[in-house]
């Protein structure tokens, strides 16, 4: 009996398990069937949409096919029309070209006739102008020959003038004056032309130029010339005699001593004198040295220095440098003096400004005391009177007077060291 009950229980359990498994399996299959049905429905919908799109695309293809056939027909028609128009245009151009050729031939004939007539007129006019210009040129050549003859006579006259001692000397003086003016030196300040002086023996001397150099130095220039310097012929002997005579006369004049004596009498202080013998050209210097190789040694022995324009310009450049440097030094001293005066003026202004500051401080302090007394004594009574019913009319009364105070503080002086301090030596 118990075994039968156990068997029955086991069978029931198995049946229950099978029923539960069958139920679960059935439920699962239902779900899968429902899911597949939904997918099938969705696929059918998609197929329906795709069929609709297919029909729409087929319609578009048919429409495009019709359009293509229509355009092909239009192209064929346009090509046919173009060929016909090209044929007609070709015929029209042929006729037009024929007419235009006839017109151009006629115009060319007319232009040839006109150009020939115009060319004949231009040739006639040009021939007339050429003849008139030729006549004018012949006249000008004749006048030019006369001018050349006059110029030749003028050149001969100038040459004769230069060959004379007076003319040669004048040329040398003019050259010297032009060099001095172009050197940058100031006339009547740095140099004097044709300075006349009288020696103690009542002998009058007139050097061509005197240049005032710094440190009590003088440069005396006396221009010398000879007709043999401009003469094209070889006159070495005469040139040597003439220049030796000039050197001797210049040394006998003793410019140095007489100029120092004369200028020192006029409250000037000069110590040294440099005497230059100026020759008008460098060729003149070469001629003098070629005529007398010992001329320079003789001149240097007499403390006289012969120079041409180039040598004189070099010495004037050095002189200008010395004069400019000396003028800069003098201006430097003047600047130092003016700076001292400026510093003194700044000190005076500082004293006055300090006094003004004190006065301003006193004024503000007194005003502040007045405003305090006014607000405390007078304005309190005014407010009491206004409370009693007496007003000021149209004029508004101030509540109080503003008070001011001055705060005095010492300024901080910021000292900055210069990168390259310059020491001024007095």
From Swiss-Prot:
Family according to the record: Belongs to the RmuC family.
Alphabetized InterPro entries for the sequence: DNA_recombination_RmuC (IPR003798)
Protein name per its UniProtKB record: DNA recombination protein RmuC homolog
Regions annotated as coiled coil: 25-85
GO biological process per UniProt: DNA recombination
Source organism: Rickettsia prowazekii (strain Madrid E)
The UniProt record lists the keyword Disulfide bond: no
Source domain of life: Bacteria
Keyword Mitochondrion (UniProt): no
Transmembrane segments: none
Entry keywords, A to Z: Coiled coil, DNA recombination
PANTHER family cross-referenced by the UniProt entry: DNA RECOMBINATION PROTEIN RMUC
Signal peptide boundaries: none
Chain's role: Involved in DNA recombination.
